[in-house]
Amino acid sequence: KSTNGGTNWTCVGHWYGAGSTPYVHADHHHADFRPGTSELYVGTDGGVYKTTNSGSSWSDLNDGMNITQYYKISQSTSDTTVILAGAQDNGSHLRSSTINWSEVTGGDGMDNGVDAVNDNLMYTSVYYGDFYKSTNGGGFFSSINTLSVSGSGNWVTPFNTDPVTTNTVYAGFKKIWKSTNAGGSWSATSSNNISGNSNIDEFEVAPSNTNYIYTLINSNIYV
């Protein structure tokens, strides 16, 4: 904000709450004062926030509103209450028999997956193929930083857990990359890119025979 016509400015809202700056969700789209008052309303990718004291503090007006936009969703094969969902601009959310939709990783929630055998082993991601892993049922996630050789994927980079074998996961860039040790290391399933310089949009591993992988790139389907 500025209190002298724009000559000087002070940050009064920050996504990460830098220092003593109060939290306001990122990606702002609109701001407006309530007529005849000092109440300022700000519209963001995380909903509506309000200040009544010139930005010294903000109120989140979105509590209790069960709304968001999910990019991707996955479910445990053994426990249907275990669900992961990646929400645009609002992180990745986990639901289970003991957790009622908790945000487990932040940023832009993208693709995700739960291990075929071990429900404590789960994965989330953010944009361009930045993946995270939890080994304790979503209590803590750490970055999987072993995929740097694959380059940059799509904004929503596709990801799948193997439908049969534990610790086995796949990620789609220009090639399909596979890990058999829960993301500890990766290898490409092919020597060449599937379709030139085009990234993979989506792919699925057949549960009847995991050697069969169907890949979608632009308007084409590859197997």
Give names to the regions the model predicted.
Residues 1-223:
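Beta-propeller blade termini and top-face loops
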